[in-house]
Regions:
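Short beta-strand immediately N-terminal to the catalytic nucleophile in serine-hydrolase-like folds
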Residues: 18-20, 46
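Gly/Ala-rich beta-loop-alpha elbow adjacent to hydrolase catalytic centers
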Residues: 20-24, 28
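Conserved acidic catalytic loop of the alpha/beta-hydrolase fold
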Residues: 1-16
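Alpha/beta-hydrolase
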Residues: 63-64, 68-154
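Conserved loop-alpha-helix segment in the C-terminal half of the alpha/beta-hydrolase fold
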Residues: 139-189
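Short, hydrophobic alpha-helix immediately C-terminal to the catalytic nucleophile
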Residues: 29-33, 202
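Flexible "cap/lid" loop of the alpha/beta hydrolase fold
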Residues: 33, 39-85
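Catalytic active-site module of serine/aspartate enzymes centered on a nucleophile-bearing elbow/loop
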Residues: 178-213
C-alpha cells in the first residue's frame, strides 16, 4: 500500500480517484483505510474488507450449486485430482454462474477453468488466493480490515453484481462500515458487470465521478 503512495507522490498526482475491481477491490479497500487523505474518491467493484467473509460466501455458493458440482469438487479436492475433467466442468459451472454469465463468453475472457490448466495458474495468484476462485488456499485468506472501515474518509462507491462470486453481502458490509458510502448492485450481473451490462456500469460510475469531482 505504501508503494502506491510513493508512486503517487513521485508522479506529483495530488489526490486521485481510485478504482479497484475484484482483488484490486481488496487492495483498494486496504489502501483507503490507511491513505484516504490521498484520495478524491474511491470506487470498489466486487471487493471486500474481509477474506474470511468472501470465502465463507463463496463456499455457500458452492453448497447451493447443483449436487453434482458440490460432490465432484469436494471429492476431487480430497483426492488432489484437480485436473480431472469432471472437476474442471464443475468449476466451470460456478464461473458461468458467478464470474461471467454471458453466453457465449466474450473473446477477452480467457481464465475459465476449461480454458486453462490449473498447473499453469499465475504463481502470485496461486500463492495469494489458490489455483482457482472457488478453492481459496492462499496466504491472503485471513486478511480482514472490516474493523478499520471507519477510517475511510473519502467519497466511496461500492458496486457488485447480484450473482457475484464476491457476493452482495461483502459490498453491504463495506457500505455499512464507510460513512457516506453509496452502494449499487447490478441486477442480472455477476463478477463482470462491465461486460454483462456496460451501459449501466458506465452510467453509475460516470454519475458518481461527476458528483464528487
Amino acid at each position: 500500500m505504501s508503494r502506491r503512495s510513493r508512486e503517487r507522490a513521485a508522479l506529483k498526482l495530488g489526490k486521485v480517484h481510485m478504482y479497484g475491481v475484484s482483488f484490486g477491490g481488496f487492495l483498494n479497500v486496504g489502501y483507503a483505510v490507511k491513505y484516504s487523505n490521498n484520495l478524491s474518491s474511491r470506487m470498489t467493484q466486487s471487493g471486500t474488507s474481509s477474506s474470511p467473509l468472501a470465502i465463507s460466501e463463496m463456499m455457500r455458493l458452492r453448497r447451493e450449486a447443483p449436487g453434482w458440482v458440490t460432490e465432484t469438487m469436494d471429492r476431487c479436492e480430497a483426492e488432489g485430482d484437480l485436473e480431472n475433467p469432471e472437476y474442471v466442468k464443475a468449476a466451470d459451472y460456478l464461473y458461468r454462474q458467478h464470474l461471467c454469465r454471458l453466453d457465449p463468453l466474450p473473446p477477452d475472457i480467457r481464465w475459465f477453468p476449461s480454458q486453462t490448466k490449473f498447473r499453469d495458474v499465475n504463481l502470485v495468484y496461486r500463492l495469494m488466493w489458490g489455483v482457482h476462485e472457488f478453492y481459496p488456499t492462499g496466504n491472503s485468506k485471513y486478511w480482514d480490515v472490516t474493523n478499520q472501515l471507519g477510517q475511510v474518509g473519502c467519497p466511496t462507491l461500492v458496486t457488485c453484481g447480484r450473482f457475484d462470486e464476491i457476493t452482495p453481502k461483502n459490498s453491504e458490509t463495506l457500505n455499512r462500515g464507510i460513512r457516506g458510502s453509496r452502494l449499487h448492485i447490478f441486477e442480472n450481473c455477476s463478477h463482470t458487470p462491465i461486460l454483462e451490462d456496460p451501459v449501466a456500469f458506465f452510467r453509475v460510475h460516470r454519475d458518481f465521478l461527476q458528483e464528487v469531482s
